[in-house]
């Protein structure tokens, strides 16, 4: 996955949603895990909505999951804000380019926890546990759970405290540098 970023992220990439967010700090949101359905998802969305209401220089793009419960909850809490765009799911090329242009990422997804640090993006993981503890240990990820107040406080901290933001965005990436396939190819050529 990390190697793929080297081929999918492009300098000349453009998209109408990114054009919309160009005058702001872009926050990418993904949230869909089954264990977060119901109140945990509501807590997550309310914390995000509160931050958007308070901090004028951010915009949120949420490529929404197909689950109808997720869609209903998102539209109810996030759907009527001019600085939040709920869009259809993105293909991998688009998604990687959105991540690359974001300021930070809020997610409950597993794969993004590996991809975003490769792009120097802080990740707030809205789950109680993660299968990627090396990212927590390295400082590229922060596990914030699904408590509304905790998400709000940690999100706001990264938006307002440059040193906290830089500590995460510049942390050593435990998931590789994106050149594993090249190294393997070089070794195989030498055999």
Report each predicted region and the residues it spans.
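Nucleotide-activated sugar donor-binding and catalytic core shared by glycosyltransferases
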Residues: 1-191
């Amino acid at each position: 996955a990390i190697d793929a970023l080297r081929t999918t992220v492009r300098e000349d990439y453009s998209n109408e949603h990114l054009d919309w967010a160009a005058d702001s700090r872009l926050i990418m949101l993904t949230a869909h895990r089954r264990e977060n359905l119901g109140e945990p998802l509501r807590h997550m969305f309310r914390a995000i909505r509160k931050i958007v209401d308070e901090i004028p220089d951010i915009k949120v793009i949420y490529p929404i999951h197909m689950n109808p419960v997720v869609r209903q909850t998102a539209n109810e809490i996030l759907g009527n804000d001019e600085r939040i765009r709920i869009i259809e799911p993105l293909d991998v090329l688009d998604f990687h380019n959105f991540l690359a242009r974001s300021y930070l990422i809020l997610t409950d997804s597993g794969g993004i926890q590996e991809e975003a640090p490769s792009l120097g993006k802080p990740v707030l993981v809205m789950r109680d546990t993660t299968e990627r503890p090396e990212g927590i240990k390295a400082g590229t990820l922060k596990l914030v759970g699904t408590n509304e107040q905790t998400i709000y406080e940690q999100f706001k901290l990264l938006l307002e405290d440059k040193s906290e933001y830089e500590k995460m965005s510049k942390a050593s990436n435990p998931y590789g540098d994106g050149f594993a396939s090249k190294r393997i190819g070089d070794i195989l050529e030498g055999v």
